[in-house]
Design a protein with these regions (language model features):
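Motif-centric detector for short Cys/His coordination patterns
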Residues: 1-72
């Protein structure tokens, strides 16, 4: 599975997948993202052609496979 884009609100992480699905998980599961500023949350990079997401300002990484397992 590969991410196409991500967004972070005050209470959830939303990832749009390349196949059209959308993953939405509570931000509380990711303390670094939860405590990051809105600006830090919005500045992410897709890793490995969308297999992961990296937030440089807080040095945090999440894998799409891990998000799918966590949301299952």
């Amino acid at each position: 599975m590969k991410a196409r884009e991500a967004s972070v609100s005050d209470d959830e992480l939303i990832v749009l997948l390349a196949d059209g699905r959308k993953i939405s998980v509570p931000l509380a599961w990711f303390p670094r993202l939860l405590h990051a500023s809105s600006d830090q949350r919005q500045k992410y990079e897709l890793l490995g052609d969308g297999e992961g997401i990296h937030w440089p300002a807080i040095d945090d990484d999440l894998s799409v496979a891990g998000l799918l397992r966590a949301g299952a």
